[in-house]
Amino acid sequence: MGETEGKVIAQNKKARHDYFIEETFEAGMVLQGTEIKSIRAGRANLKDSFARVSNGEVYLHNCHISEYEQGNRYNHEPTRARKLLLHKKQIDTLIGQTQQKGYTIVPLKIYIKNGFAKCLIGLGKGKKTFDKRETLRRRDAKREVERALKEKNR
């Protein structure tokens, strides 16, 4: 649903390895002043982060945004829960899908678009170990084919 246009700040590379991403949503983020300054400086990390719906609102948990270096005593807490801004229809879709067994909301990347910090979240279904191995095999086979075609064209 949402394609990134701006500068990518942080990516969750493990998300596509651990989950089948079925649908993506672009969400705005409610941030404090020092948080947006740290994000613009590229000091955000999505490792081990997840999103959860509570009271009809979506929150991003465990997203680490480092404290701003020039911040004073009013600096933000690095891993606090941050509210994500979505349309009501999108939230209802997420609520309905996450109540099914095995589905979760996974943050994929944080980026700046038109001056605003956005978070691309995906509706993911957990992969089993054999699915992960199959994905790796498929990717390796694709690399081998591309390598063979490249050498053939020389």
UniProtKB/Swiss-Prot annotation:
Major subcellular site: cytoplasm
Keyword ATP-binding: no
Function: Required for rescue of stalled ribosomes mediated by trans-translation. Binds to transfer-messenger RNA (tmRNA), required for stable association of tmRNA with ribosomes. tmRNA and SmpB together mimic tRNA shape, replacing the anticodon stem-loop with SmpB. tmRNA is encoded by the ssrA gene; the 2 termini fold to resemble tRNA(Ala) and it encodes a 'tag peptide', a short internal open reading frame. During trans-translation Ala-aminoacylated tmRNA acts like a tRNA, entering the A-site of stalled ribosomes, displacing the stalled mRNA.
Keywords: Cytoplasm, RNA-binding
Compartment list: Cytoplasm
Transmembrane segments: none
GO molecular function: RNA binding
BP GO annotations: trans-translation
GO cellular component: cytosol
Key word Ubl conjugation present: no
Gene: smpB
PANTHER family hit by this protein: SSRA-BINDING PROTEIN (PTHR30308:SF2), TMRNA-BINDING COMPONENT OF TRANS-TRANSLATION TAGGING COMPLEX (PTHR30308)
Region of interest: Disordered: 134-154
Sequence similarity: Belongs to the SmpB family.
Source organism of the structure: Halalkalibacterium halodurans (strain ATCC BAA-125 / DSM 18197 / FERM 7344 / JCM 9153 / C-125)
SUPFAM superfamilies given in the database record: Small protein B (SmpB)
The protein's name in its UniProt record: SsrA-binding protein
